[in-house]
Amino acid sequence: MTTVSASPRPLQVAILVFDDVEALDLGGPYEVFTTACRMQQRLQPGTPTPFAVQCVARSLQPVQARAGLRVLPDADFTTAAAPDVLIVPGGVVDTAAACAETRTWVAQAAAGAQITASVCTGAFILAAAGVLTEGPATTHWEDIADLRAQFPALDVQENVRWVDRGALVTSAGISAGIDMSLHLVARLAGPALSKRTARQMDTPWNPEP
């Protein structure tokens, strides 16, 4: 596992959003990284914020998440800041994974990012984009067989919350994205901030996957 050194500027965190994205897949990481910014100011007032978070979509039109939640993207593929951390959530991903524009942006963003991570079935988008091609990975328990069948070069892991390969991290389903994001905060900004973030969110935090 690679630990990324502290940055003098906020690390750009881009969360991909698309129609039928799972609401907690995007909301969990968003809450973790933005809460970490608030907690940094409580732990060390006046220090630089560690993260700048944006939701990125194919266009600036509102995205309708699974179950009807509407999300207004902060940027589209042409205006988004180059991410240091790319988060690809899951949901009903068939359309997003089949979209050439989405695959191209994900591949380009991942190539320049320090860490690329998927939540749940977001692993299918990473695989379709050619970012996740082989080695260990995980996804929602319900989709493990499909991920193995569609991408047989992957070593799909069961009964883990996340799989960390350094620059590439995949998590299990839905709420596991919160755990993985806390893990990423620990890697990027230190375990003290991760623990304080988990406490603020009133969520149990286990640093082991």
For the regions a language model picked out, list residue spans one by one.
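Active-site-proximal catalytic alpha-helix in oxidoreductases
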Residues: 123, 169-185
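Amphipathic alpha-helical segments enriched in hydrophobic/aromatic residues interleaved with Lys/Arg
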Residues: 159-171
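Extended, subdomain-level signal for the structured scaffold at the beginning of enzyme domains
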Residues: 1-116, 127-128, 145, 157-159, ...
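Structural detector of well-ordered beta-strand residues that form the stable sheet scaffold
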Residues: 116-117, 138, 157, 169
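Glycine-rich, charge-decorated loop segments at or immediately adjacent to ligand/cofactor-binding or catalytic sites
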Residues: 124-132
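A conserved active-site-flanking secondary-structure segment within enzyme catalytic domains
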Residues: 132-159, 200
